[in-house]
From Swiss-Prot:
Signal peptide range: none
Domain S4 RNA-binding: 37-99
Highest taxon above the source species: Archaea
Family recorded in the similarity comment: Belongs to the eukaryotic ribosomal protein eS4 family.
Organism: Sulfurisphaera tokodaii (strain DSM 16993 / JCM 10545 / NBRC 100140 / 7) (Sulfolobus tokodaii)
GO CC term (a single one): cytosolic small ribosomal subunit
HAMAP family (UniProt xref): Ribosomal_eS4
Name of the molecule in the record: Small ribosomal subunit protein eS4
SMART domains xrefs: S4 (SM00363)
Keywords attached to this entry: Ribonucleoprotein, Ribosomal protein, RNA-binding, rRNA-binding
Molecular function via GO: rRNA binding; structural constituent of ribosome
GO BP terms in the entry: translation
Length: 243
């Protein structure tokens, strides 16, 4: 289906429900329909670089828009958590970050910041040769050669800071107490601070373990382990762009 009614679209999309009946439906891709923004809608309604959907489509088709360092010519391409949007011709760069009101929002970043993406390891698999494949949240995979496994055997839910589009790993942030994290789901989405405690459940740890995060204002919030993404050691990584 090429389109979707505005009432059926994800609740967080920045759309006027009374303007038109139909809107763009995101194509299958690295992010779920319920957790993404179609590229053309992002350009028109969030970044304001196009006044009409037709203008947004033209920008995409002409190859002026890059997502995670690669030109995307599909105006329905799904853009989601921590994706980097680059418009080199206008010297504009953005990162999609969690927001407490709008769920996902673009924040302006520098050209230097746009070289990096932050992704969580959702699971790992070991092949018959002893190599480890890291399966990341945005659908990409990184293969760790057998000889490098001892030094690069990252735990699941670790956040990797990678170069894009090369996928070279620059830094890793393991999910543990004392690390700086942002909440990426649930009612406290978008709030961030230092992880004070992690209460691990005996079963279904990601769903039922409780993480307490202390914000910069001193207030604490709690969420499930699966909703937490580490974005720094004791402070935010300077290239993230979260304020």
């Amino acid at each position: 289906m090429a389109h979707i009614t505005r009432f059926e679209a994800p609740w967080f999309l920045n759309l006027s429900k009374k303007e038109y009946k139909w809107t763009i439906r995101a194509n299958p891709g690295p992010h779920k329909l319920s957790e993404s923004i179609p590229l053309a809608l992002l350009l028109k309604h969030y970044l304001n670089v196009a006044e009409t959907t037709r203008e947004a489509k033209r920008l995409v088709v002409e190859g002026k828009i890059m997502v995670d360092g690669r030109v995307r010519k599909d105006y329905k391409f799904p853009v989601g958590l921590m994706d980097v949007i680059s418009i080199p011709s206008s010297d504009l760069y953005f990162r999609i970050v969690p927001d407490n009101i709008k769920y996902l929002m673009p924040v302006k970043i520098s050209k230097e910041d746009a070289k990096y993406k932050f992704v969580r390891i959702v699971n790992k698999t070991t092949n018959k040769n002893g190599n480890i494949q890291l399966n990341l949240e945005d659908g990409r995979n990184i293969l760790i050669p057998k000889e490098k496994v001892p030094e690069m055997n990252y735990p699941t839910l670790t956040t990797l800071k990678i170069e894009i589009p090369s996928q070279n790993i620059i830094k890793s942030y393991e999910l543990s107490e004392g690390k700086y994290a942002i909440i990426i789901g649930g009612r406290n989405v978008g709030l961030h601070g230092v992880i004070k405690t992690i209460q691990y459940a005996k079963y279904k740890k990601r769903k039922y373990s409780i993480v307490t995060i202390e914000q910069k204002n001193g207030e604490s919030v709690q969420t499930n382990l699966q909703n937490v993404m580490v974005i720094g050691d004791s402070e935010i990584d300077p290239n993230v762009g979260v304020r």
